[in-house]
Amino acid sequence: MIDEKQRSAGARPGKGSRERSADRPRRREPLPPSARLAASAALAGETPRADRLIEYLHRLQDEHGALFADHLAALAEALQLARAEVYEVASFYHHFDIVRAGEAAPPALTVRVCESLGCAMAGGVELAASLATRLGADVRVQRVPCVGRCDSAPVAVVGQKPVLHADADSVAAAVAGGERDEPLPDAIRFDAYRAAGGYRLWQAVRSGEIAGDTVIAALDAAGLRGLGGAGFPAARKWRTVAAQPAPRLMAVNIDEGEPGTFKDRHYLETDPHRFIEGMLIAAHVVGIDGIWIYIRDEYPALRRLLAGELDRVRAAWPDLSPIELRRGAGAYVCGEESAMIESIEGKRGMPRLRPPYVAEVGLFGRPTLEHNLETLWWVRDIVAPALAGGPDPFASRGRNGRKGLRSFSVSGRVLRPGVVVTDAGITLRELVDEHCGGMLPGHELYGYFPGGASGGMLPARLADVPLDFDTLGAYGCFIGSAAIVVFSQFDRARVLAENAMEFFAHESCGQCTPCRVGTAKAAELMKQPAWDAALLTELGTTMMDASICGLGQAAPNPMQSVLRFFPHEVGVAGENKEGAA
């Protein structure tokens, strides 16, 4: 297992220092005892670890309602970090409220109203404006990015309790009702899962009854790819990490912040142990010495559920390698694998330059197997039938020449939004008609996002294109996390593209100029009644070519889709094939 020296060495770079003039010492006010008590309570009796900084910050804010300057200073002292290091981490993440000396704390209750694609189409922006005047000064109303419940738009979160299909009356009632926590979902728990045959495959792999190479071969034959968005072949990733020197680590990404995506939430709410078993199989086959699970802060009930079920797994098998559950803090960029690793290490979630890749130099400087939750969820269903000689329920599916199953998060102007598990290669028209009950009454298909905000936009005339990895590139789009956002003749593609670009500008980590400046500049230019097509095209090309990570590289996609498929909306010359919105 990785030791504390390795953890510290991999967690943060060496510290430089400057000589300070002896006759000009820096003076600081002594910390009050209450600040040290608050920091000590946040540590909860643990040996202080710099990589757990974000968790300590969460505990401070959970207890005190905000991050007060004295508390941050005391926490830095306890962790033996510079105050600036703690401050830069706390100020990076959107969910932390820093209160400087002399400033007033925020109201005790915050209502967060989603304004991302699906919720904006359902009136989320107007809802936020209404609540800001209705709820009074003792409640803070924030407009926030996607909260992962797009199938129930619009959504407001009162404290930590989501109000689905929200309106001003239902949110006001939730505020008055006083309940602030979301109840645990009715998921399949450990005892029920094990009684139905769960964990038998993992035990067979662990005992050596089933060889690791056999498991990898089954994944290879099924064609399982990373289902968080990148689509990298899972079997190849397992082989690559297994070939690296020990200790090897594992990071699981449940930070599904892509607007329109909620499939991982669905799987955790219904059958979390299928994912946990897949994770344990992967860990054994690859030779993993420690596992870190990173779940988005917007899913507090799922975090509590997962923590409890992991405790039951540890109780059943006490000799498991360490498994740590970490929560994010509202940074979309931490869905990128290297930014997530930086966050797990207790730092700002800023993507790393590559190479080296995380499979070689990842978490705490060690080779790291990184996977999305859904990828691991399918492992048992692929491997068990393959070993039994039966048909593979994953690879035997598919249409239009594609292979496998996909979990589509469908939202927008359809009658029945939700997670649809169906054939890879299905078309948008087939998906909506066969699984979503068609369009809402009175609505006609005008266009859709095939892969969330970053996946670009396609017009209705391209509703018969197969939806899968590698099928949408010719149209300047990609499937990504398979977040399908459907819009109708009552929507404007340009407004949705502006929404997406403002989201990317808000979520840019700021590390590289093409993304930091490019998203902000594009968002400004896109507000003009007539777009400057040449300038926006040049700006988008620069962002795609020069940005460090996928955020800046994909941010121009919706903008470029409007120029290509909906030029009539932005005063750009071109044939109007889509019909006026």
Question: What label would you give each PLM region?
Answer:
Residues 93, 271-285:
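Histidine-anchored nucleotide/phosphate-binding helix
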Residues 193-200, 252-264, 358-363, 409-414:
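Gly-rich Lys/Arg/Thr-decorated short loops/hinges at beta-loop-alpha junctions or inter-strand turns
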Residues 303-424, 436:
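Hydrophobic alpha-helical positions that pack around
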Residues 17, 21-111, 115-147, 151-180, ...:
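Ferredoxin-type iron-sulfur electron-transfer modules in oxidoreductases and energy-metabolism complexes
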Residues 174-221, 371-394:
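Flexible inter-domain linker/hinge segments
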Residues 278-282, 424-441:
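Short amphipathic, charge-patterned alpha-helical segments
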